């Protein structure tokens, strides 16, 4: 305490123990509060750090209807995490709303774009958000390019149920990868799927990416 160390003396290194707190600002705005085991009201991220968390994940939506998880909202949460010494993962959904295995809706502003335009959209959106974070001195350790992409992304163009779709998906992942490395060369890029217990799914997606020139550093796996 009383130093410039944002970690508050907590060890934020080693194995990443993280929480996705993307709903936090919306929850706070609706009046929700957080309490420790003694019933004392606490700031959520401070309490999580005290309980052993050392990393925060934040999702990004392109133009969400109510503003939550927008670029500006993400910056506000990332700044709070940064000032507590957290390591940070940014999760790009490339959608105006939640992207999951069945729903990979294009942002409204991208709906009529060609595949080549979509690749530019991915690149510019990724660089725009990450540049804003970097300009504030915030380090980003991991970047997730797409969310639960077990059937691809930006449907129908990047849906992996056809050869062309699989090729497009690899191009989209690579567009995101290259954009990340341009802003944060040391950041680790994650391709994220759900159903971590289904080996055939991972073989299909990652063999397809490999065959079609897709680039990634880490396989992200969710198990529910």
Language-model features: where?
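Short, flexible loop/turn elements at secondary-structure junctions
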Residues: 23, 60-62, 147-149, 193-195, ...
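Bacterial Sec-dependent N-terminal signal peptides
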Residues: 1-10
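Long, well-ordered mid-to-C-terminal structural blocks that present hydrophobic/aromatic surfaces
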Residues: 215-224
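Active-site cleft segment of glycoside hydrolase catalytic domains centered on the general acid/base Glu
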Residues: 70-75, 79, 100-214
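Short loop/turn motifs at secondary-structure junctions
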Residues: 15, 52, 85, 138-139, ...
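N-terminal substrate-binding region of glycoside hydrolase catalytic domains
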Residues: 10-87, 93-122, 128, 220
């Amino acid at each position: 305490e009383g130093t410039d160390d944002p970690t508050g003396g907590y060890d934020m290194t080693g194995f990443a123990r993280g929480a996705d707190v993307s709903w936090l600002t919306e929850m706070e705005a609706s009046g929700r509060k957080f309490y420790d085991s003694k019933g004392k009201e606490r700031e959520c991220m401070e309490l999580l750090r005290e309980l052993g968390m050392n990393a925060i994940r934040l999702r990004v939506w392109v133009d969400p209807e109510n503003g939550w998880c927008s670029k500006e909202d993400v910056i506000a949460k990332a700044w709070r995490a940064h000032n507590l010494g957290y390591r940070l993962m940014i999760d790009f959904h490339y959608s105006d709303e939640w992207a999951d295995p069945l729903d990979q809706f294009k942002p409204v502003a991208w709906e009529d774009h060609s595949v080549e335009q979509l690749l530019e959209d991915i690149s510019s959106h990724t660089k725009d958000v990450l540049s804003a974070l970097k300009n504030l001195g915030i380090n980003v350790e991991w970047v997730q390019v797409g969310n639960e992409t077990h059937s691809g992304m930006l449907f129908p163009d990047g849906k992996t149920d056809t050869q062309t779709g699989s090729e497009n998906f690899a191009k989209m992942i690579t567009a995101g990868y290259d954009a990340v490395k341009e802003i944060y060369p040391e950041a680790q890029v994650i391709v994220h799927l759900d159903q971590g217990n289904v080996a055939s799914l991972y073989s299909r997606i990652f063999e397809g990416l490999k065959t079609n020139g897709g680039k990634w550093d880490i396989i992200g796996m969710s198990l529910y």
